[in-house]
């Protein structure tokens, strides 16, 4: 079998061909090249063609890509790009549909619970808090280390329910006393529990601390102390803030429903304004948030606050505070905040307006303040949660709510709003008054027999002087 010709750059044939002089004129050079190609069909035309492979039965022939092939590849690339865009839009609208359906289900459930009354709303808040704690406890839990610490996860819930007993015992103290005042035995029992509630909660916490110390294991200290700190962070940042919602509920369902509705309105408006008009990123922590969504949602929230307050203020059972733990419908004097007042327009406006003034509820001006906070400051609770999730490299805190993530994902702004609403109500709206049952409970628990007798005589003198018109 004949050996293939050596056509490497340093072969004798190639060196001889390189040293051969050719005519310099274009025509002569072309003819000479043609003669050379005919005589040496397998010799490269120039030094840059030395990678050329001689023709043989097993050699691979390399062709220059034709323009038609380039055009076909460009067309395929464009079709692929358009398909990806269409698929992205399809997924985008599918996500919006799932989010809308789950929002409607949640809205229907919340409306039904609100219709049931104060205690059912409180129960709903407690359930949400439990789910939020479960989602956050799970973030720091490691299965392989939990197997070495059987029952250690129960310690988290021990601290959680101890905090719940302490916080809610302080919040519903007055309502609890008013509920049991008719039964003497239960009244004494409840009064004793209220009096020593802080002591009971403190020793429950100490019991949990001792339990934690007794479960410490070698080579597990870092994980266990991390869990201990994580649990307390959840109790302070999450549970305590959300518990202000319960205090607002007993001041009247109105003060629970209005702040929650404003946050929901802000969230929905930001989503739709960002979906259709969003172009300018707002903050790096949350890339999907845009300035267009933020501004549009702010305007929509402030306008909605004025409207929601007027609509909700028409229902007496929403505005009455709950003084006990009963479940019946309430009837009360709504107070001046919920009585319409007429505000005349300035004289320079009346020539240009068909109306001489406007009739609104005074509470609508307070709602304006709540709407302003909900539109500007409350979203930063969501930004805080976004940074928190980035730190743990997770998309959502959970998957309990389709299209929304977990309960914590929905409640991040609500917690910030609940604290502000409580502070605003206590500072500018509620005039703190005590019921007869609450005052009698304080007297019976704080004063001795002789002091109670002196108080009785003093009250008798005051009443007698009032009747005689001298006091």
UniProtKB/Swiss-Prot annotation:
One annotated GO biological process: CDP-diacylglycerol biosynthetic process
Q: How does it sit in the membrane?
A: Multi-pass membrane protein
Q: Which residues form a coiled coil?
A: none
| GO CC terms of this entry | membrane
**Protein name, please?**
Phosphatidate cytidylyltransferase 3
Residue ranges annotated as transmembrane are: 97-116, 120-139, 149-169, 196-216, 228-250, 255-277, 293-313, 368-388
Question: Which residue intervals make up region (Disordered)?
Answer: 1-72
What are this entry's molecular-function GO terms? phosphatidate cytidylyltransferase activity
Q: Does the keyword Nucleotidyltransferase apply?
A: yes
Its pathway, per UniProt, is: Phospholipid metabolism; CDP-diacylglycerol biosynthesis; CDP-diacylglycerol from sn-glycerol 3-phosphate: step 3/3
Polar residues: bias regions: 21-35
Reaction catalysed by this chain?
A: a 1,2-diacyl-sn-glycero-3-phosphate + CTP + H(+) = a CDP-1,2-diacyl-sn-glycerol + diphosphate
Q: Which gene encodes it?
A: CDS3
**What Pfam families does the entry give?**
CTP_transf_1
Q: Which family does it belong to?
A: Belongs to the CDS family.
Q: Which cysteines are joined by disulfide bonds?
A: none
| Primary localisation category | membrane
